[in-house]
Amino acid sequence: MKKIWLALAGLVLAFSASAAQYEDGKQYTTLEKPVAGAPQVLEFFSFFCPHCYQFEEVLHISDNVKKKLPEGVKMTKYHVNFMGGDLGKDLTQAWAVAMALGVEDKVTVPLFEGVQKTQTIRSASDIRDVFINAGIKGEEYDAAWNSFVVKSLVAQQEKAAADVQLRGVPAMFVNGKYQLNPQGMDTSNMDVFVQQYADTVKYLSEEK
């Protein structure tokens, strides 16, 4: 009996120590108004955002978060249209096309690089070329671009940003209740930061 009690006490202490690593107002903040029906893990970004580029291509935040997520928990990425003017809106629609066709992984890097690195993306036609170079047929892209599904996905992205009162990117939300706060994490070492970021998402995804 004593051994069982000690084992249970050990589990409680381990849980307490784990929970103590994460503090509301430090690594994350709780939304004043939770969003019902929000994706389990939702990241907002813009191809015009330098920090988003760093998160994706240098730190690989998305990949590390996905690796840590509990089984059955899905991560969703939405593009915002409040950066880049009309081209930013075109990129939001193009991202909706990517989601509809399931080719997000194929176009993320070339879109980021075309906007920020080579600056070869300056029009909707340039965006279309990225998809074609990634192996998507032009007619397939055009059909998706003009489809009801894509229009719905554009509206969905815009509504999601409004629901959480999004003020900037990159930003990640969990269960429609919590927003990650990178400023409250250890940035002295990038590997440690990435690990802490991913671990915090995992912790919050398991919170009810």
UniProtKB/Swiss-Prot annotation:
Q: Which GO terms describe its molecular function?
A: disulfide oxidoreductase activity
- Which family does this protein fall into? Belongs to the thioredoxin family. DsbA subfamily.
Pfam families registered for this protein in UniProt: DSBA (PF01323)
Which stretches make up the Thioredoxin domain? 20-150
Q: What is this protein called?
A: Thiol:disulfide interchange protein DsbA
Q: What does this protein do?
A: Required for disulfide bond formation in some periplasmic proteins such as PhoA or OmpA. Acts by transferring its disulfide bond to other proteins and is reduced in the process. DsbA is reoxidized by DsbB. It is required for pilus biogenesis.
Q: Name one GO cellular component term.
A: periplasmic space
Leader sequence segment: 1-19
* Compartments where found: Periplasm
Q: Does the keyword Signal apply?
A: yes
Record key words, sorted: Disulfide bond, Periplasm, Redox-active center, Signal
User: Which top-rank group of organisms is this from?
Assistant: Bacteria
Kindly give the SUPFAM superfamilies that the UniProt entry links to this protein.
Thioredoxin-like
Q: Which cysteines are joined by disulfide bonds?
A: 49-52
Lineage of the native species? Bacteria, Pseudomonadati, Pseudomonadota, Gammaproteobacteria, Enterobacterales
Q: Which organism is it from?
A: Shigella flexneri
Q: What Gene3D superfamilies does the record tag this protein with?
A: Glutaredoxin
